[in-house]
Amino acid sequence: QVELVKLLTSPNPGELKVAYRMGLTAVFLPEFDVMMETPQNNPHHCCSVGEHTLKAIEAVPADKVLRLTMLLHDIAKPACRTTDKKGVDHFYGHPVRGSEMARGILRRLKFDNDTIDRVCRLVHWHDDNPELSGKAVRRAVHRIGVEQYPALFAVKRADILAQSGYRRAEKLAYVDAYEQMYRECMEKKECLTIRELAVSGQDLIAAGMQPGKQIGEMLNELLDRVLEDPGLNTKEQLLKIVTGKISDQNRS
């Protein structure tokens, strides 16, 4: 683990290829060897999964979590590879499966739980592209976890820069717009979690709700509405929704 991190965060992480040629990765990271031997016949790519991975590692800052993420972001591509009738390769489901594989690899290499969790979440979501609207971006940040930002943007850019030039400008423009919307959301301090709602479980009980799992369900419903329309996040408006629900239930 120590030697791998030292190599990945060095000025020359591409030296991993030397370790591959010497047969060293076959011992501690055999999954990397499989990536080196997996082609990507696809307009978005111009080299093997392994070569793409090496370029992606070099395209992120020399941070342990970011470089481990780029090392493992496409780890499941060999297992997920399918080829269509035209001879084009596809890798459906590789981010989710890759996240599971990354967890196993990082545990095997005895990384700490915090590093494992952060890397696996970034691997899981590296290909997620929400629609460029305020509500879609708020929902994405809520779903992915605010702590994965802004690292996720570095991951997405490195992935694009390590691909072929096909639609590169368009892909990078998308990430720029996504990041801009995320930053606006943070500047406005928009509510993204239950903790940031203007009401708490205690407020719902005080408004007449019975304690129990329905409190959690109601808070989730309120958050869903606030992600749609941040202007609703005032105590007055949220309690109005709650009391409306209570009177509806009492009527029925």
Can you annotate each of these PLM segments?
Residues 1-71, 75-93, 97-111, 129, ...:
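Glycine- and charge-enriched loop/helix tracts that form the active or gating conduit
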Residues 7-31, 144-169:
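Structured, non-catalytic alpha/beta "coupling" segments that mediate domain-domain communication
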Residues 10-14, 51, 97, 114, ...:
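Generic recognition of short, well-ordered alpha-helical interface segments
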Residues 32, 140, 199:
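Short clusters of hydrophobic/aromatic residues that line enzyme substrate/ligand-binding pockets
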Residues 40-50, 54-58, 111-168:
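Histidine/acidic-rich helix-loop-helix segments that form or flank divalent-metal centers
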Residues 65-66, 151, 192:
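Alpha-helical hydrophobic/aromatic positions enriched in membrane-embedded helices and signal peptides
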Residues 99-103, 120, 201:
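An amphipathic alpha-helix signature
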Residues 104-108, 163-252:
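Charged substrate- and nucleic-acid-binding regions of tRNA-handling and nucleotidyl-transfer enzymes
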